[in-house]
């Protein structure tokens, strides 16, 4: 019996150690890939695929919003985009940037095929993403009152984003 308890304790300890190592590695990778926001980005007017104006300062006023850089060619985005869509369905303000994913019609076709309805700014040449120094897709920035308060790169989940949004709303 004592041997079984000892084995359970060691397994739990190993799980905790490996979990903490994973979290620390994830934080280090996010720090390394940290985007840098362009000057006066919050006041810029962007136009989505439907030619509707989008201003980050307005979208992030009083509540955090997601700025989501993705690509139709990105394998990790195929797992992250449904979480972003679910947050959009939950009434979270979302603005996305389709990085080098084709012309506006190709991006619209991809969105229809995948049943995504979040607003998309097309970045066919990568100029917008370059101005943010985006190094990986997906990259998600959480912006509140026109200021970047959190960011993450790579694979993420609905609940991971939900917790980040909640923490951002506390500030």
Regions found by a protein language model. Name each.
Residues 1-47, 171:
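N-terminal targeting signals for export/organelle localization
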Residues 40, 63, 135-137:
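Short, small/polar residue-rich loop motifs at catalytic or cofactor-binding pockets
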Residues 47, 119-123:
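Short acidic-hydrophobic, aromatic-tinged amphipathic segments that line or gate anion-handling sites
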Residues 55-78, 84:
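Short active-site neighborhood of thiol/selenol oxidoreductases, capturing the structured segment around
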Residues 62-64, 90-93, 118:
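Loop/turn elements at helix/coil->beta-strand transitions in domains of secreted/extracellular proteins
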Residues 66-67, 94, 140:
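Hydrophobic beta-strand anchors of alpha/beta hydrolase catalytic cores
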Residues 78-114, 124-130:
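Structural microenvironment flanking redox-active thiols in thiol-disulfide oxidoreductases
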Residues 112-116, 124-169:
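Thiol/disulfide oxidoreductase modules built on the thioredoxin-like
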């Amino acid at each position: 019996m004592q041997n079984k308890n000892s084995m359970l304790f060691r397994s739990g300890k190993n799980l905790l150690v490996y979990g903490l190592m994973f979290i620390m590695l994830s934080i280090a990778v996010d720090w390394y890939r940290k985007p840098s926001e362009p000057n006066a980005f919050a006041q810029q007017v962007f136009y989505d695929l439907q030619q509707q104006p989008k201003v980050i300062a307005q979208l992030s006023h009083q509540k955090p919003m997601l700025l989501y850089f993705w690509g139709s060619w990105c394998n990790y985005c195929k797992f992250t985009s449904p979480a972003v869509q679910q947050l959009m369905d939950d009434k979270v303000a979302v603005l996305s940037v389709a990085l080098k994913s084709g012309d506006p019609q190709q991006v619209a076709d991809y969105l229809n095929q995948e049943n995504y309805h979040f607003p998309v700014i097309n970045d066919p040449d990568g100029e917008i993403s370059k101005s943010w120094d985006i190094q990986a897709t997906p990259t998600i920035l959480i912006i509140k009152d026109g200021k970047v308060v959190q960011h993450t790169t790579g694979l993420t989940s609905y609940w991971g984003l939900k917790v980040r949004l909640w923490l951002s709303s506390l500030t």
